[in-house]
């Protein structure tokens, strides 16, 4: 179907419906009929949207999603993908939500507290929350029982098919045993109800209709962040009984029940989703919502740019070529409207392999000896200038991508409001350093001069038989020209920073699976990988690098330090001592369960030790540029959970935001999170 991007004789919404912007009309699923015409400002009435610029806010908003990220499951209890959660977060609320700084705020829970050792958590619920159907008609009142039903569904292997069990089985008393029981029962487990779960000793109870109590296996001072995960969302037994287990598991927008800020007005698979306000939303008086929110599936950014220019999109992310098109023309109207977004909630780092093999399966002793040396590793953190490489991710402000920490910024705050990584910066001695657009923060102390460290490393390593240059093997997928371009620039960064007489990047390729072709046979010198949090505590990051823990992901699957620990070579003694000391620091911090500030201070010391010894070397944040009519800094910005696409309290403007305005938003945001 042809798309006439010049037409102005149709509405924005009718254009999107008729255009089929991803090339196929898809399957139409609608609910509510003409009733949507009555939603308007009445259903959306409540708190005024934030307005820091005096602009005229938008009543309707058109956002976008990549065509390869279409929703697959509308059931949050069953789904395990963010692409699903990004949709359903607007339709289905849980105990907790987040604000624009990523801090926990009440949702269905109004308040919560823990006992002294943080093993028992009590949540007090609102008494005014209803389930509604796709027409916005009230079906049932939500009580604490709905959360019992939801957890039983998740833990019942016959019902939820083992999805989303990891969080409750890891933390809740009896949850793992109940899951195993249902797995052993097979199909018969489908007949179990929440009372069977309680009788089996699972650590959840509802002493009254609006109180929910969880009992944890061990002290868990961050459990309020754990229950933000979708495993702990409510479900209605009445709806499950009405639909049956199979249909409830595979429910869609037409037969599910809603308790979130919106209901689905219309869904055209592969094309658009439109939401209108839930007329019985419990928090309507306290949050602003759009009269209509439309999400358009986009298969090509060139199409997205045309749609944005024609005001058929209100926001879009920009790739490098589009930015180049705009910035290469000084008269381009969008030059003043380029808006830099906040970092995506993932911290990327260079994960060294301490037990590397050659292609024939024999140990790569040269690399293994080199990477076990502290001075050698410190050259990466203190001397590798990645500014040119960052430009691949942020063409305009490459150093905004600099990541100096292992834990993602914004993960958690102490009781004084200070963001956790500011505590790490203080431990590292660069808390007074600020972004200047010129020099990486961690290179400023010595100007990136690692000549003394390099000399020390080469002398110490030559004495144990290491030959130079040390080859650092880095794998990229063979089919990606972009990955090759990135790797070529990274290789030049190695040359410029280390000198080819010291460390030389060797770029290799894999066909399809990094895990099977590279990580499992242990062929890499390092992998650059990102970690996104599961919950809001530093141990979720720092615990991935410890020894003596089967759940330490990177220790087992990337660095292989857990394998080294089984039989370390003589040259790995100092390395193992460093990991043991780091592990002790993490465990000491994790044992502090009744003093949040002391806990975070202790974790900051552990993280600083990790960084000073460069057991892993942080690399970058992913920061995109956009054209937009929404203030990104007004949106939910959680580092964990699935709430970031919840469209409440967005500040918007009829006029596109400018670069200057976004710089002001960023400055205010940074000041706020630094306490």
Protein language model features and the residues they cover:
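N-terminal lobe/hinge region of extracytoplasmic solute-binding protein
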Residues: 63-117, 257
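Gly/Pro-rich hinge or "lid" segments in bacterial periplasmic/extracellular proteins
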Residues: 186-201, 207-210, 215-294, 302, ...
């Amino acid at each position: 179907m042809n798309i006439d991007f010049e037409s102005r004789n149709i509405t924005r919404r009718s254009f999107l419906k008729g255009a089929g912007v991803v090339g196929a009309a898809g399957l139409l699923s609608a609910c509510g009929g003409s009733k949507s015409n009555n939603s308007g400002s009445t259903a959306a009435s409540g708190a005024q949207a934030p307005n820091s610029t005096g602009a005229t806010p938008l009543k309707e908003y058109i956002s976008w999603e990549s065509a390869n990220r279409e929703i697959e499951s509308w059931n949050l209890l069953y789904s395990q993908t963010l692409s699903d959660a990004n949709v359903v977060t607007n339709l289905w609320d849980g105990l907790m939500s987040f604000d624009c700084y990523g801090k926990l705020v009440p949702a269905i829970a109004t308040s919560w507290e823990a006992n002294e050792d943080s093993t028992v958590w009590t949540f007090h619920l609102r008494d005014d929350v209803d389930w509604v159907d796709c027409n916005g008609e009230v079906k049932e009142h939500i009580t604490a029982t709905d959360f019992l039903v939801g957890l039983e569904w998740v833990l019942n292997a016959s019902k939820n098919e083992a999805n989303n069990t990891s969080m409750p089985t890891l933390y809740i008393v009896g949850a793992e045993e109940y899951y195993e029981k249902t797995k052993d029962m097979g199909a018969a487990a489908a007949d179990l109800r929440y009372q069977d779960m309680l009788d089996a000793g699972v650590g959840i109870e509802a002493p009254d209709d609006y109180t929910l109590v969880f009992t944890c296996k061990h002290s868990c001072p961050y459990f309020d962040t754990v229950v933000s995960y979708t495993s702990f969302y409510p479900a209605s037994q009445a709806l499950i009984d009405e639909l049956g287990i199979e249909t409830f598991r595979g429910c869609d927008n037409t037969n599910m029940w809603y308790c979130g800020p919106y209901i689905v007005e219309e869904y055209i698979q592969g094309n658009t989703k439109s939401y209108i306000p839930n007329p019985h939303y419990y928090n309507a008086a306290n949050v602003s919502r759009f009269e209509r929110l439309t999400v358009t599936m986009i298969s090509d950014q060139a199409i997205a740019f045309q749609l944005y220019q024609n005001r058929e999109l209100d926001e879009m992310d920009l790739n490098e070529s589009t930015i180049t098109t705009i910035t290469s023309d000084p008269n381009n109207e969008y030059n003043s409207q380029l808006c830099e977004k906040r970092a995506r909630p993932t911290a990327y780092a260079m994960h060294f392999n301490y037990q590397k093999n050659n292609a024939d399966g024999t140990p790569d002793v040269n690399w293994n000896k080199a990477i076990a040396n502290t001075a050698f590793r410190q050259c990466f953190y203190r001397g590798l200038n990645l500014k040119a490489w960052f430009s691949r991710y942020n063409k305009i402000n490459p150093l905004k991508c600099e990541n100096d920490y292992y834990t993602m910024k914004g993960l958690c705050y102490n009781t004084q409001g200070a963001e956790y990584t500011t505590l790490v910066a203080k431990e590292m001695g660069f808390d007074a350093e600020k972004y200047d657009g010129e020099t990486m923060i961690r290179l400023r102390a010595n100007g990136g001069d690692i000549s003394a460290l390099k000399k020390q490393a080469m002398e110490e390593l030559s004495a144990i038989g290491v030959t130079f240059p040390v080859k650092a093997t880095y794998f990229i997928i063979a089919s990606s020209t972009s990955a090759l371009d990135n790797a070529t620039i990274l290789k030049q960064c190695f040359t410029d920073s280390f000198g080819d007489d010291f460390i030389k990047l060797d770029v290799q390729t894999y066909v399809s699976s990094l895990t099977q072709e590279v990580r499992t046979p242990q062929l890499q010198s390092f992998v650059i990988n990102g970690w996104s949090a599961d919950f809001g505590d530093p141990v979720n990051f720092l615990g991935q690098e410890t020894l003596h823990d089967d759940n330490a992901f990177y220790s087992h699957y990337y660095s292989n330090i857990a394998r080294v620990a089984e039989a370390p070579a003589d040259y790995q003694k100092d390395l193992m001592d460093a990991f043991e000391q780091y592990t002790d620091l993490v465990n000491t911090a994790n044992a502090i369960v009744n003093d949040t500030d002391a806990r975070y201070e202790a974790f900051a010391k552990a993280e600083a030790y990790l960084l000073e010894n460069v057991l892993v070397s942080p690399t970058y944040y992913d920061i995109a540029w956009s054209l937009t009519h929404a203030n990104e800094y007004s949106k939910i910005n959680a580092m964990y959970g699935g709430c970031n696409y919840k469209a409440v309290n967005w500040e918007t403007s009829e006029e596109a935001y400018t670069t200057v305005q976004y710089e002001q938003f960023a400055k205010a945001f940074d000041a706020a999170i630094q306490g």
